[in-house]
Amino acid sequence: MRPMQLDMLSEMDDAGSSMAMDVDDLEAMEILNEGGLVSDNKLADADFFNKFDDDFDDTDIN
């Protein structure tokens, strides 16, 4: 016998009610939104890959 759809939804609601909340996630998002850490972290290879010329035909895009 297959479980009814209502039974499966009620089980999902019960499982989420007991989970703990992480407070640190909010603080990390606030720091990233302010731009304090985003501008400081630059990939080491970013300049290397930007040195290559674009050889794609962009006429069909515009």
UniProtKB/Swiss-Prot annotation:
Phenotypic effect of disruption: No visible phenotype, except a longer hypocotyl in light-grown seedlings.
Keyword vocabulary terms for this entry: Auxin signaling pathway
Domain of life: Eukaryota
Keyword Transferase annotated: no
Statement: the UniProt record of this protein carries the keyword Glycoprotein: no
GO BP: any one term: epigenetic regulation of gene expression
Tissue-by-tissue expression: Expressed in roots, flowers, siliques, stems, leaves and seeds. In flowers, detected in petals, anthers and pistils.
Self-association state and partner proteins as the record states: Interacts with the COP9 signalosome.
This protein's domain notes: The F/D-rich region (45-62) is necessary but not sufficient for SMAP1 function.
Functional description taken from the UniProt entry: Mediates responses to the synthetic auxin 2,4-dichlorophenoxyacetic acid (2,4-D). Not involved in the response to indole-3-acetic acid (IAA). Interacts with RUB modification-related components and may regulate the cullin-ring ubiquitin E3 ligase complex (CRL) activity.
Identification of the protein by name: Small acidic protein 1
Record organism: Arabidopsis thaliana (Mouse-ear cress)
